[in-house]
């Protein structure tokens, strides 16, 4: 089975990376740059693809963020839930697609399925690697924004479909959630859909993460930084 490298030795050296079909919740407070961590974890390596569902940034901003990491934009797709509200006539391209708003979960689901199908058919980009099933990294940035627009029970069902889809196609999913804005019931329900949780905290301007739910990987807090799409654990 395919393993998705993370660039974090504490994970890769123990289990080779995230197993295919794994869904990971990044639980982080505001202003902790969790999106930068998430993008580093879904940066597509050679032969891989990345898809971002963006409810916070325009597609162009997401592509720029990945460009700074050195990722090949030919293998990055964005489902943009922001731009169409201000530019209703904007048209989909092969790799950048648009929905009316973060409330349009049906539209998001359709665009996601269509993009997956395009990748599987080898029509997403030139220079296809030929791996099958094609390794796909997926990110929802962010679950917090979706929860502002839809009831928890509705969003739970939506995420249940997404996580099941990622498992079926042997991809890997990263989902960002603000750890300070929601009650324990909400956090608990979202966690039920995940295989593991990466918690992030900031203390005295130093970033820490810990991994929970991956067998053999320590759950101790680790100092870290992210630069150019690479996560570095600081001794």
Where are these regions (language model features)?
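Glycine-rich P-loop/Walker A and Walker A-like loops and their local beta1-loop-alpha1 context
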Residues: 2-65
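Nucleotide-state-sensitive switch-loop elements of NTP-binding domains
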Residues: 56-59, 63-106
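Short glycine-/polar-rich loops that comprise or flank the Walker A/P-loop
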Residues: 21-22, 47-49, 74, 169-171, ...
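Substrate-engagement module of ASCE P-loop NTPases
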Residues: 150, 154-181
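Phosphate-binding/switch loop-helix module in NTP-utilizing enzymes
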Residues: 85-161
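Phosphate-binding/switch region of NTP-binding enzymes
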Residues: 171, 176-235
């Amino acid at each position: 089975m395919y393993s998705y490298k993370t660039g974090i030795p504490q994970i890769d050296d123990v289990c080779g990376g995230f197993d295919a079909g794994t869904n990971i919740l990044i639980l982080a407070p505001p202003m902790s740059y969790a999106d930068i961590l998430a993008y580093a974890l879904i940066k597509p390596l050679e032969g891989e693809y990345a898809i971002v569902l963006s409810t916070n940034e325009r597609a162009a901003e997401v592509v720029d963020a990945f460009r700074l990491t050195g990722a090949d934009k030919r293998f990055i797709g964005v489902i943009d839930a922001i731009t169409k509200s201000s530019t209703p006539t904007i048209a989909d391209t092969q790799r950048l697609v648009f929905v009316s708003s973060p409330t349009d979960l049906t539209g998001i689901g359709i665009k996601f399925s269509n993009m997956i199908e395009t990748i599987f058919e080898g029509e997403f980009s030139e220079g296809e690697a030929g791996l099958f099933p094609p390794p796909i990294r997926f990110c929802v940035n962010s679950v917090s924004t979706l929860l502002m627009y839809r009831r928890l029970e509705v969003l739970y069902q939506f995420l249940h479909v997404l996580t099941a889809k990622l498992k079926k196609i042997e991809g890997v999913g990263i989902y960002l959630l603000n750890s300070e804005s929601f009650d324990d019931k909400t956090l608990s329900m979202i966690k039920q859909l995940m295989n593991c949780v990466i918690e992030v905290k900031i203390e005295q301007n130093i970033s820490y993460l810990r991994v929970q739910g991956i067998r053999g990987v320590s759950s101790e807090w680790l100092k870290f930084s992210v630069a150019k799409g690479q996560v570095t654990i600081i001794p």
